């Protein structure tokens, strides 16, 4: 009887050793497969001929495609309306205006304060008379006193001119500098805004791709228990 038990115990020990060895082989194979998948995801090697044809058939991501995608994203986020509103305000501000039809400073002061301030900014005036400038009497009264002239927001002249109180003259150098500065700032803003939008969209796409890769790796790492058991049985049978 004890002699019969000893070979059975030896057989059970040999079976347990074989089972442990097969299980260790399965775990090693799983770790190798995971390392291979990680290496393939990090570096897939140079593209083959079939991959090159597929890449040629696939849509190419260029500057205009990124711009169109950014515009679609902005339209979905309802930010494109604000950009269009800003663009049309700039167009209205920089449209050509006939200076002969503009009112004088006294009439502009009677307008609303925001519009009057805007006209003062884009069409500044000064009391300095430059060469070949026509002088107009203040309120059609050229012989007003200095106090009345200042009350009417006009310029008084103490030199030997015919008109002692005249309306302010257009300051063209200051106007050119202001318009040029505002145009330069608006061009810079409108130039960098699409670039910023494109960079934001590109970063978002890159983050989405990275998240997709991580999800795929996690899904590959989490294998079902039934599949592991079938692999262990197959190795034990061999």
Curated annotation (Swiss-Prot):
Membrane topology: Multi-pass membrane protein
Biased composition (Basic and acidic residues): 15-30, 228-238
Keyword Protease: no
Main location per the UniProt record: membrane
Ranges in the topological domain labelled Cytoplasmic: 1-79, 200-238
Cellular component annotations (GO), alphabetically ordered: membrane
Transmembrane segments: 80-100, 179-199
Bias (Basic residues) ranges: 214-227
InterPro entries in the cross-refs: FMR1-like
P-type domain residues: 118-176
Domain of life: Eukaryota
Keyword terms of this UniProt record: Membrane, Transmembrane, Transmembrane helix
Record's keyword annotation contains Membrane: yes
Segments in the Extracellular topological domain: 101-178
Name this protein carries in UniProt: Fmr1 neighbor protein
Protein source organism: Mus musculus (Mouse)
GN (gene name): Fmr1nb
